[in-house]
Every structure is written in C-alpha cells, then in structure tokens.
UniProtKB/Swiss-Prot annotation:
Keywords: DNA-binding, Methyltransferase, Restriction system, S-adenosyl-L-methionine, Transferase. This is Type II methyltransferase M.ScaI. It comes from Streptomyces caespitosus. Gene3D superfamilies: Vaccinia Virus protein VP39. The keyword S-adenosyl-L-methionine applies. The gene is scaIM.
Amino acid sequence: MSGRDFGYVIQSSAALWNRLSTFSQRGKALDTRLADIKKALGKPYYETSDVLLYHGDSLELLKSMPQQIFDLTVTSPPYNIGKEYEGVLSIEEYISWCETWMSRVHRATSAGGAFWLNVGYVPVPNQGKAVPIPYLLWDKSPFYMIQEVVWNYGAGVASRKSFSPRNEKFLWYVRDPLNYYFDLDSVRDPNVKYPNQKKNGKLKCNPLGKNPTDVWQFPKVTSGAKRSSVERTAHPAQFPSAVIERVIKACSPSDGVILDPFLGSGTTSLTARKQGRCSVGIEIREDYLDIAVGRLEAEAQSLF
C-alpha cells in the first residue's frame, strides 16, 4: 500500500469513527422523531421498532407530517398512464398534484436531507407519445436538483415503431445544495479500481473502487413462469431492491429515517431495514400494504 493510499484509509477510518461516535447521541433524537410522527399521524397500520406504515392518502398524511423529520425520501408515484392501480388525470392536473405532494415532502425533509424521485414516461396529447415525466416535473418542487440518474434495466417490452424502452429516470434533489449528506465511498464499485487513465505516468484510482456514475445497470423485477424475479410480488410496478439500496447507502446516514409516500409493495422499507435505517411508508391501497407487511415479517423471521 502506498503512503497516499494509507493516508486515505486513515482518513476514511476517522470519518467512519466520527459517524459511529455520534450514533448514541442521535439515538434519542431518532426515537423522538418516530414518536413525533406517530403523534402527528396517529396509530400506524403496522409498527415495529424501525418501521411505521400508514394506510391512507399521501397528500393528506403529508400535510400533517412534522417538519424536517426525514433524512431521505425515495419514491415512485403513479405515472398517470392508466394502470389498474392508478387513475388518470389531465397533464395539468397531474403536474399540480405532484407539485403539492412534493412541496409537503420538502417541508418534512431535514436540513441536510435528500429526495429521490423515480418517474417514467407519459403520453402528452398532440405533443408526444412517451414524454419523460422528469421534463415536466424537474423544477416543480422547492428542492434543489443535483442530478438525473438513468436506471438501465435491460429487458423490457419490445416495440415495432420506436426503439424499445430500457430505462427510467431518477431525479436527485436536496434541500440545501451547500450542506447535504452524500457517502460516495459506500457505493463505489470495488470490482473496477483501475480505469484506463494515467496522470504523471501513474494510474489514477480510488482504493475503494470506481464511482458508479449516473447510469445504473440493474435488472427490472420481472414476472412470468420462466423469468420471474425472486423478489417479485403481486404489485405491477415494483422497485428492485438493489436500486434503492444504492440510494439509501449514498444519501442517508446510518441512523437516518427514510420516507416513501407511495410505498407500494414495501421495497423501500424492507431495504431500509436491511441497511439499518428506520422508515415510514404511506400507501393508499390496503392490499399493497399487506404485501409490504408480509415481506417485512418474512425478513424478520429469516433473522432467527
């Protein structure tokens, strides 16, 4: 190990120790935050020491949420394309609806917190067949946008009159562009340490691995008798846990509280638990909440 690499390891270890040493100080604050949420929203549909799930309309529940309570929100709202689990609004109504709930998420986000929004494509009458929803929403919240991340999921629906769609977008926002949590080292790719770059005749690299870039390669959660994903549930638009894991690791502290106001099948809460974070989920459909509860219970049982 070179002197520079050794110094980097020492600095990284010191940073880790500083985070660990503050855990006990923030532990009480964590309990207080969860208690404040229960006081504001009432009895949860499901509750454990690290998960609160609520059944109801996100727009209404977010209105009652305490201010600056969450370190990270990561969610995927309905895309407004008429799937069986969502209604269809006009484009103007959909944008207005998103503006409202995003402003309420902003109010509930901590000073150093982040908001990750996953959205796909929507037809716009007389203008476009598949308009990326980020083009309609990117500046419709009080947050500051850091970056667009492209999720390339590989397999998908084939198309005869256009290129087959193989990606969705994540928009990464923060409350304060000068002070936000970001732990790049926790999500570096350790299998790519030596890219083909040199400086002064020496390889440029980080000993922990490569920055994963803004294009993420993760397979979609698939269905079907021969190709169904292991984590597949009855929800028709399910997040892969690997995507959410990267977001949680990079953009929330180890004792953070995470929100998903459109919880669906519970992937955000399940992944947050596996990463040692607490979470709050809101879902309007009780059958999806029951799926989420079942996944959380199964994961808890697997630990014994």
